[in-house]
């Protein structure tokens, strides 16, 4: 596996606790620096890892020039235009989910990456966390699944939630957009692409999705960031001719999962083989979530 120069775009909590430690420790990465919208945050994170800090338009251009690939830890609507610029400049992409929050922007990013011939990976955690990734790969090799169910009950904004770093885009977009990509990435891994989706809103920020897949299977998802602590948790279950399979208990750390995503990007670069969770997959998730959001708005929900 070749060594790649990778810069980090983003300097918030997610970048601090997941992206930067994984990039700094990876033997196949030369960590080229941290770019942030807030210069002081970029400087603090960069100093912690002994790399240069960048900010502003000129700083982004400098990090781009110094890197073979960029890893993003930004809100989706900030990430998308910067990632499109990076792709057009021939840089490989390690993207956060969702890649964008409107279908046209997601498709434009995917088109730019395809036209430039760059490798890309979207960090949908369950597809890279070793335990869940192995489980999903095993299920995908087996036939006979008729349905699946994914529940992502986050408690970030629950009435009894502990204080957490503010994230305006998550508060605005809610569970559909924040944890929706996780649920869809699990369901699509086993049951295939989606040909029809229906969305219904329950309690505030509780969204239910019903999906019909191209395989003929159906599935459902429940998504929120506002669950009470006692109700918070993640589950995924598939049912078929071989019985019932449920998501393994226990979770790998975010650094371990992101390290696997880095491995996947490096492999895609070396082999010139697209990863299943590339930017086109990310754009497809955005299309599905945008369709669901449109249905909710049309229903006044």
Where do the model's predicted regions map?
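Hydrophobic residues in well-ordered beta-strands that form the structural core
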Residues: 15, 55, 95, 120-122
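Beta-loop-alpha module in the N-terminal Rossmann-like domain of NAD(P)-dependent dehydrogenases
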Residues: 38, 49-110
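N-terminal Rossmann-like dinucleotide-binding module
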Residues: 1-49
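C-terminal helix-rich "cap/oligomerization" subdomain common to oxidoreductases
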Residues: 1, 58-61, 69-71, 214, ...
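Contiguous beta-strand/loop segments that form the cofactor/metal-binding neighborhood of enzyme cores
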Residues: 181-248, 263-271
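Mid-domain beta-loop-alpha active-site segment that forms a flexible
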Residues: 123-130, 161-194, 282
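A contiguous active-site-proximal alpha/beta segment in oxidoreductase catalytic domains
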Residues: 100-160
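A short helix->loop->beta-strand "cap" motif at the edges of active sites that frequently abuts
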Residues: 51, 89-91, 116-118, 216-217
């Amino acid at each position: 596996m070749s060594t790649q120069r990778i810069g980090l775009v983003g300097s918030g909590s997610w970048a601090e606790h997941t992206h930067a430690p994984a990039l700094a420790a990876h033997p196949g990465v030369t960590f080229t620096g941290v770019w942030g919208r807030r210069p002081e945050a970029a400087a603090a994170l960069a100093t912690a890892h002994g790399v240069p800090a960048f900010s502003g338009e000129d700083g982004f251009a400098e990090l781009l020039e110094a890197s073979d690939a960029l890893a993003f830890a930004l809100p989706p609507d900030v990430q998308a235009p910067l990632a499109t610029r990076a792709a057009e400049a021939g840089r490989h992409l390690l993207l956060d989910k969702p890649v964008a929050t409107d279908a046209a922007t997601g498709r434009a990013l995917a088109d730019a990456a395809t036209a430039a011939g760059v490798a890309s990976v979207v960090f949908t955690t369950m597809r890279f966390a070793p335990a869940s990734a192995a489980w999903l790969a095993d299920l995908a090799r087996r036939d006979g699944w008729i349905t699946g169910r994914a529940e992502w009950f986050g408690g970030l904004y629950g009435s009894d939630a502990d204080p957490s770093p503010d994230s305006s885009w998550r508060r605005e977009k809610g569970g559909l957009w924040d944890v929706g990509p996780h649920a869809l990435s699990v369901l699509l891994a086993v049951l295939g692409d989606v040909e029809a989706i229906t969305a219904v809103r329950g309690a505030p920020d509780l969204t239910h999705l019903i999906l019909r897949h191209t395989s003929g299977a159906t599935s459902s998802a429940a998504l929120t960031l506002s669950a009470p602590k006692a109700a918070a948790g993640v589950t995924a279950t598939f049912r078929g001719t071989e019985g019932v399979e449920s998501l393994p208990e226990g979770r790998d750390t975010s650094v371990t999962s992101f390290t696997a995503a880095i491995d996947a990007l490096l492999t895609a670069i070396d082999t010139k083989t697209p990863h299943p969770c590339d930017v086109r997959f990310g754009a497809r998730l955005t299309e599905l979530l945008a369709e669901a959001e449109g249905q909710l708005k049309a229903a006044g929900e």
